Design a protein with these regions (language model features):
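Hydrophobic alpha-helical segments
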Residues: 1-182
């Protein structure tokens, strides 16, 4: 059970209702969930978080497959159950190979058939492990993704790390029937 009350739209202030509607425009689920069910209590946090989320959900520069790879790596690192359950199928729909997803779940290095996935994996796992990136890893990432791609990849990883902290602190459970980490 979550540590924070899940509020219904009709119980929100006018500002929160407007924000709720804006958030729901880009999400397929019928009710506010995940970190936004926490952030809705603080519209000053929810508004910029929603704008940043849309950079990755609605108009990413990187291929959505790579965005979802980043998200799953961060979710696994944080054992963020809700985010994993929300992104497991999104990753498959974006074209991420199921064997890669299962390797991430098992905390094993996947076998990659695509260089861009291997490079993103190396960038993000190194960043998560050491909180910085070596010159060699940065150079490979810059050659493959470009400057803007690295900015997006690292910002996405940081955003989902923040989401993992919020989800875990407020014990937001996985989506009903969603895939879970063990």
């Amino acid at each position: 059970m979550a540590r924070i009350e899940q509020v219904e739209r009709d119980k929100l202030t006018a500002r929160q209702q407007t924000l709720y509607d804006d958030i729901m425009r880009t999400r397929p689920r019928g009710k506010l969930s995940g970190p936004f069910s926490v952030w809705i209590h603080r519209p000053d946090i929810a508004e910029p978080a929603n704008r940043l989320a849309n950079c990755f959900r609605v108009s990413p520069k990187l291929d959505k497959r790579l965005i979802e790879l980043i998200v799953l790596l961060v979710c696994r690192d944080a054992t963020a159950q809700y985010a994993w359950s929300a992104h497991f199928n999104l990753a498959r729909e974006a074209g991420l190979n199921g064997e890669i997803i299962e390797a991430i779940r098992a905390r094993r290095r996947p076998e990659f058939g695509r260089d861009d996935e291997r490079i993103v994996y190396d960038l993000v796992t190194e960043l998560l492990a050491s909180k910085k990136v070596s010159s060699a890893t940065y150079g490979r990432a810059e050659a493959a993704l470009g400057r803007d791609g690295i900015i997006e990849a690292v910002t996405c990883a940081g955003f989902y790390a923040m989401i993992g902290l919020v989800l875990n602190t407020f014990e937001i459970p996985p989506q009903p029937g969603g895939d879970v980490l063990t």
